[in-house]
Amino acid sequence: MATVSMRDMLQAGVHFGHQTRYWNPKMKPFIFGARNKVHIINLEKTVPMFNEALAELSKISSRKGKILFVGTKRAASEAVKEHALSCDQFFVNHRWLGGMLTNWKTVRQSIKRLKDLEIQSQDGTFDKLTKKEALMRTRELSKLENSLGGIKDMGGLPDALFVVDADHEHIAIKEANNLGIPVFSIVDTNSDPDGVDFIIPGNDDAIRAVSLYLTAVAATVREGRSQDLAQQAEETFAEAE
């Protein structure tokens, strides 16, 4: 299982929180102090909490669990997509649509529409339409791909959420809470940790910090999935004997 050290976190700037005036008092247990009116996160808390989260994510992925990566703000968007794809998982990296989890039935219909449009764009259907109609469908396809492309093959609700910014993604967290889906989240000093099952106190703005979290999570998920595949191979071999 991938692990992250104190040194890795220091180099990535994980310990830098927000300005002290923007703090959420619920994050007090995870704050070491302040420097130049900026809160410093206690990495002695973060390191074991992150590694505990990784261990749990490894268990989920080794049971074929589906993990949804959520990070819709600019600093995280591309990295969220890249790392989710690198471990064959799912992502939302633009806008979180209200009801994405709690109204899955409707979302599933939109995903079906997205897949239908993808087929039409490839089988020549668009070429037979008027320019105006083809343009409208192309725009619809682009819009649906933007919002649902990362979950179109999820095939049902996820088994866990990995969230980059608890404050920014509070709607996603609330929906997961309502459905009993465990939430793993980076929680900065300005955020509310309530509703997060596995809190990872840390900087959620610095690109290097965000990349550090995502790299470790993706590696852990890949490893967990390979354990599952190895176990399947062993069982198949045993049956053959």
Swiss-Prot record:
Cellular component terms per the entry's GO annotation: cytosolic small ribosomal subunit
Name of a matching Pfam family: Ribosomal_S2
HAMAP family: Ribosomal_uS2_B
Gene: rpsB
GO MF term (any one): structural constituent of ribosome
PANTHER family (alphabetical): 30S RIBOSOMAL PROTEIN S2 PROKARYOTIC AND ORGANELLAR (PTHR12534), SMALL RIBOSOMAL SUBUNIT PROTEIN US2M (PTHR12534:SF0)
Any one biological process term the GO annotation gives: translation
Keywords: Ribonucleoprotein, Ribosomal protein
Record-given protein name: Small ribosomal subunit protein uS2
